[in-house]
């Protein structure tokens, strides 16, 4: 989602609250609980969940391993749910022509550096760069080139579904900033 007025443009960045993250968090949570309960059921020699039978599973070694995998999966699921709740990675890119400032804001993990805020001068922006790698794991990233700085990614790897969307976004931004486009 973009917001553009005469001299100000704001590009909002979706963080970790994506449908894919919700799906993975649910899959991991239920899978890990299933593993843990089957492993623990093999220890008790009693089915804790009626449709997950543990009668044929010996506690040592299979039950212990299933409990371990279940606990590990619960930790990973907890991590995913925390990033979703904190909305890590969300924020905005703000281009203010009146003040001549380009700002990047992102939410991070809790702590003293939770708010990540970086500013650059718009006059130092040299160009917009597109990086495209096609194939099985395609990668499409939009960068901004600034004098004396490494290229700064403006988008996440999975943000653009098509090359056309990426080209349109790069052209819009380059037109607004009056800079050139590199890549492709």
From Swiss-Prot:
GO terms for cellular component: chloroplast thylakoid membrane; photosystem I. One of its GO terms (biological process) is photosynthesis. Keywords: Chloroplast, Membrane, Photosynthesis, Plastid, Thylakoid, Transmembrane, Transmembrane helix. InterPro entries: PSI_Ycf4_assembly. The chain crosses the membrane at residues 21-43, 58-80. Belongs to the Ycf4 family. Seems to be required for the assembly of the photosystem I complex. This is Photosystem I assembly protein Ycf4. It comes from Marchantia polymorpha (Common liverwort). The lineage of its organism: Eukaryota, Viridiplantae, Streptophyta, Embryophyta, Marchantiophyta.
């Amino acid at each position: 989602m973009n917001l553009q007025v005469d001299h100000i443009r704001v590009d909002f960045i979706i963080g970790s609250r994506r449908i894919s993250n919700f799906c993975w968090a649910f899959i991991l949570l239920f899978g890990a609980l299933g593993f843990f309960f089957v492993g623990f059921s093999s220890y008790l020699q009693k089915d804790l969940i009626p449709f997950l039978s543990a009668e044929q599973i010996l506690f040592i070694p299979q039950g212990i391993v299933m409990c371990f995998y279940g606990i590990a999966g619960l930790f990973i699921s907890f991590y995913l749910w925390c990033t979703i709740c904190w909305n890590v990675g969300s924020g905005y890119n703000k281009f203010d022509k009146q003040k001549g400032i380009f700002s990047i804001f992102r939410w991070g993990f809790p702590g003293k550096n939770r708010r990540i805020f970086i500013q650059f001068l718009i006059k130092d922006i040299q160009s917009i760069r597109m990086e495209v790698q096609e194939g099985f794991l395609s990668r499409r990233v939009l960068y901004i080139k600034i004098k004396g700085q490494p290229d700064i990614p403006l988008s996440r790897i999975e943000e653009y579904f098509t090359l056309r969307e990426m080209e349109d976004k790069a052209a819009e931004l380059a037109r607004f900033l009056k800079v050139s486009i590199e890549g492709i």
